[in-house]
Amino acid sequence: LLVFYLNSQFVLAQERFEPIKVSEDNFIIDGLLDEEAWQNETLVTIENEISPGNNTAARVETRGLITYTDTHLFIGFHALDNPKNIRASIRPRDNFSLWSDDVVLVRLDPYADGRNNYIIVVNPLGSHFDVRSVNAIEEDDRYDISFNMEFETAGQLVSDGYQVEIKIPFSSLPFPNGKDQLWHFNFFRKYFDNGNEIELSSQTFDRDNSCEVCQTTDQLVLKDIVIEKRFELLPYIAGNFSGKRAQAQAPFDFDKLNPNAGLGVNLDLNKTSTLEITMNPDFSQVEADVTQIDINSSYALEYPERRPFLIEEPMWLILLMVLSILVQSIIP
């Protein structure tokens, strides 16, 4: 009886949202929710304070809006507050110091299975980062920061707070095959009150449940969407040569140019299967524009993994490496 009661509470916590599909011509992503298409769209209120309050009523108003077209999901936020209290700076993408700003956040679980959340975080000026969240025991294992998807954001301060717009192509997200979709999602907001960090959610949050991704359960119904298959061609060409001086004042004597080239292909067979081929991949690629300071460090600097072939599904690569080692051990 107790188990049935708890399950009933879980089911009742779900809400179902069925936004109306609109024309993409009605949207300009400028950070202002002034387009006519937003006026009658599905409203999602962020009314639960989950920290420091424990599912208490939010003390500020936050409106989330959601709609979609054949090929894109559109999300809007209107976060009400005194503009003087809002913290925001223009930051590069995937700069996690963004978390020290006021932010709004959307979690998407396209498979509705509580295994993955695809998260987009945006501050009042439109700066953003994205991350994939999984169910893991250790905090450091819960977030895959190498995950990147295509999307567009914009944000602006307004007289009663700030507004944010997000445009997400369906082609950038994994989800089950089919034109009609049932996803799980929720919205989140973080702001500051007298220096204290306040967190709000569109759903209640169970602190005793260690599975955060399992608590993204509001239902989002999408009908008759267009599934665009992704095709990416990633060629590269590089070369190097070296030289030396025979004597201190002599000119450099250079060797011949050593050219190198390779190709990567990424093709969606359908929404659940992807064919990825690489020939002579450029394993020297790193995100070298990441700012890091090295002063008398006893360890080398590390850069985040950005090579497409290695971040699509790293677990498959680990499995292949393990199988390769086993085969070599069995068949010397």
Model-derived regions, located:
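Bacterial Sec-dependent N-terminal signal peptides
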Residues: L1-F17
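Structural preference for beta-rich elements and adjacent junctions enriched in aromatics
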Residues: A13-P332
